[in-house]
């Protein structure tokens, strides 16, 4: 895989073996690397294949600390397994971005109201139960305590 752009020390945008743009994460993956160089495959922790606009998706991922990205993805995948659903990369990126922003809001002392929570609980009780379990797991592993309604 050839690097197209280094976003930070842990995130690179690449062209993979079959010509698709992909986003790779891993500790030190982009450290002292440049566009045109090959990727050290031993450093790859995750690979995301965006449906479209790989550049903007890569920037979202690059803006999230690697430890937080890994934690949120692990907790989300566990919840998806319990629910018995597949997890496309685009969904993972959306959830990771949402949870990261929620953590930043909490850190800044901002509180959000979720007026559709009761409706979501009624229409999707199992998904809501798993989301609440995700919040509990994230709270146990992070310094930021997300509100139950998140």
Feature-to-residue mapping (PLM):
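A cross-family "folded-core" feature that marks the main globular domain of proteins
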Residues: 2-150
């Amino acid at each position: 895989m050839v690097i197209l752009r280094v976003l930070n020390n842990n995130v690179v945008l690449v062209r993979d073996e079959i010509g698709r743009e992909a986003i790779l994460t891993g500790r030190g993956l982009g450290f002292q690397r440049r566009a045109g160089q090959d990727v050290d495959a031993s450093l790859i922790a995750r690979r995301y294949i965006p449906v479209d606009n790989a550049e903007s998706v890569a920037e979202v991922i690059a803006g999230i600390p690697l430890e937080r990205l890994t934690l949120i993805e692990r907790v989300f995948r566990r919840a998806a397994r319990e629910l018995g659903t597949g997890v496309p990369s685009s969904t993972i990126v959306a959830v990771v971005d949402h949870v990261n922003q929620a953590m930043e809001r909490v850190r800044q002392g901002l509180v959000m109201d979720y007026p559709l929570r009761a409706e979501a609980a009624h229409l999707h009780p199992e998904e809501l139960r798993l989301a609440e379990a995700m919040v509990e797991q994230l709270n146990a592993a992070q310094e930021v305590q997300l509100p139950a309604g998140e």
